Amino acid sequence: MNTTKKLMTMLLVMLAITAGHAQDATERSISVEALGVHNIVGINFDSRFRGNHGIGFRVGVGYAQGKGKHIYFSPSGTKTQGVAFPIEINYLLGKKEQKLELGLGASLGYYGERMEFGIIGGHQYMPVTEKKFGYFVFGNIGYRLQTNSGLMIRIGWAPSINFDDGGCHYLQRRLLSSLYISVGWRL
């Protein structure tokens, strides 16, 4: 079984386990996140297994976009955009409104990569678009303010690493780092 299939199987099992526990959760929230694992913008559902602290999970959907350079094949660069689905297991430390958030997860995505060709060696090349599956794993270290009135604000850092993405150039960077900000509301 290749790495992609193993990762997909592991994520589906994690999602099934967390969905079963979600029925007992006492704290749930929905939020809009800029940057971070979504790259541009995304929507997240977050839930604790008990109370408003300890272990929980987050699932989301987001829009990703990026630009890159291909020195040999596309001197004009590449443009990548697509949809991503991050899944994270996280832990909240703290007793009141202010908490430290720690998490690990993976983001699965389907991306369209457009290579903008130009003139190379006197020959003109046309743009090429490829659709590709890509994924990366990420960590999460953040500050979470969750007020008694229901407002939730998250600010943090989500470093990510890609191991093998099947050639999706947007995701081929080995060490990605991204700050994020998120605003949400308790459900």
Report the location of each language-model feature.
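Gram-negative (and chloroplast) outer-membrane scaffold detector with strong preference
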Residues: N44-L151, I155
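Outer-membrane beta-barrel pore domains and translocons
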Residues: G20, L35-V37, G60-A64, G105-G109, ...
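Outer-membrane beta-barrel "beta-signal"
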Residues: L175-L187
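Bacterial Sec-dependent N-terminal signal peptides
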Residues: M1-T26, V183
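Residue-level preference for beta-strand/loop junctions
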Residues: T26, V37, Q81, F133-Y135, ...
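A periodicity- and composition-biased signal for non-globular, repetitive helical segments
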Residues: L11-L12, A64, G150, S160
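A short, hydrophobic/aromatic-rich structural module that often spans a beta strand
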Residues: R114-G122, W157-C168, R173
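Solvent-exposed loop/turn segments connecting transmembrane beta-strands
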Residues: S29-N44, G51-H53, V61-K67, K96, ...
